[in-house]
Structures are given as structure tokens and as C-alpha cells.
Amino acid sequence: MSRYRGPRFKKIRRLGALPGLTSKRPRAGSDLRNQSRSGKRSQYRIRLEEKQKLRFHYGLTERQLLKYVRIAGKAKGSTGQVLLQLLEMRLDNILFRLGMASTIPGARQLVNHRHILVNGRIVDIPSYRCKPRDIITAKDEQKSRALIQNYLDSSPHEELPKHLTLHSFQYKGLVNQIIDSKWVGLKINELLVVEYYSRQT
């Protein structure tokens, strides 16, 4: 299944706020109206919607998300928590959380077009897994810096998650540590996502 490129507002009206996909928010109460129209939701649908929420927020294909679930399942600790950490430490998501891109698709474009360096080297793989002490910078070219400055100027000045530091005048972000689950940028019940996939096998 390919990455979603359809109408974004349609998705947030059904699934709730997806800040990685779009800065738009559903109107207050619209999700409640949708639920009342559809009646009582089945457990399968609840799990499916949580999975879709995760997939659309991080901009993943079905195959990519399944791969992350399998990696998380083999790691030590809670599968759901490890899954969120893997997704949050992707380079495209780190750029988004730093405010160097307004959405995750926007961050992915910056990476694909070779505007981003990690530890002084160009990285053009959006799924690159960032590690503690990684230094993320814009390429030292006017076009790259202008693009990121535009994002920094327009992004809401929200509190940065504790695992990141931004030096905006230097177009530089630092990864201090692996993200703590309470700083994940999406309201999600990750256990339902793990349950969804465990019931598919």
C-alpha cells in the first residue's frame, strides 16, 4: 500500500489531529459527531483507527509500519513504547519536531532533496535513525537555509521535547537522548496498534 497523498482534512476529521500530516485541526466535536453517526465502534475498528492514525501521522506505507512493528517486537521492553521511539527518532520526524519543517512530508522533501546534513554528511534517507549526540544541520547553501528559515519563522513556538535542542540561528539541531514516551507528538494508544498487527498474523 502506498503512502497517503489524498485530502488531509478528510483524514483528520475521521482520526483527529495528525500534526505530522497537517497543521490543520478538526473542528471541535466533529469526531464525536462522526462516532455518533456510525454508532458503537467495533474493537477491530478502534484498533484499525489507532493504526491508521500512526501511519498517517508519520507518513508511512503499510509495509513500512509493519516492518517497524516487527523490529519493535524483537527488541527488549514494551513493543508499543519501542515502536514509538523508532518512529520518533526517524530523521524526517526529528526535523519536524525541531520546527525545521512544518510537516513530516515537508521534512521528507528536505531530506530527499539533499538539504540536510547529519554530523557533517549529507543524508538523503528520511527514515535514517537518529542517535543521541547526532548533530543535524542545513546544508551551507542559501537555498537550503532559506527553506528552513521559512519553516522556522512560520512554525508555532511550542516547547521542544526534552530529547532535542535547537540552535535556530545556526540552523542546527541536537539529539540529546532517545525520546521519552511522554514527549511523543501524537495522542495514541500504541498498544492497540500492536494488538491490531498481532491479530493479523
UniProtKB/Swiss-Prot annotation:
Subunit structure: Part of the 30S ribosomal subunit. Contacts protein S5. The interaction surface between S4 and S5 is involved in control of translational fidelity.
Cellular location(s): Plastid, Chloroplast
One BP term from GO: ribosomal small subunit biogenesis
Family matches, as PROSITE patterns: RIBOSOMAL_S4, S4
Region annotation Disordered: where it falls in the sequence: 20-43
GO MF term (any one): rRNA binding
Family membership: Belongs to the universal ribosomal protein uS4 family.
Database matches in InterPro entries: Ribosomal_uS4, Ribosomal_uS4_bac-type, Ribosomal_uS4_CS, Ribosomal_uS4_N, S4_RNA-bd, S4_RNA-bd_sf
Free-text function comment from the UniProt entry: One of the primary rRNA binding proteins, it binds directly to 16S rRNA where it nucleates assembly of the body of the 30S subunit. With S5 and S12 plays an important role in translational accuracy.
Gene3D superfamilies with a match to the protein in the record: Ribosomal Protein S4 Delta 41, Chain A, domain 1, RNA-binding S4 domain
Pfam families according to UniProt: Ribosomal_S4, S4
Keywords: Chloroplast, Plastid, Ribonucleoprotein, Ribosomal protein, RNA-binding, rRNA-binding
PANTHER family the record matches: 30S 40S RIBOSOMAL PROTEIN, SMALL RIBOSOMAL SUBUNIT PROTEIN US4M
Domain S4 RNA-binding: 89-149
Source organism per UniProt: Buxus microphylla (Littleleaf boxwood)
GO CC terms in record: chloroplast; small ribosomal subunit
Protein name per UniProt: Small ribosomal subunit protein uS4c
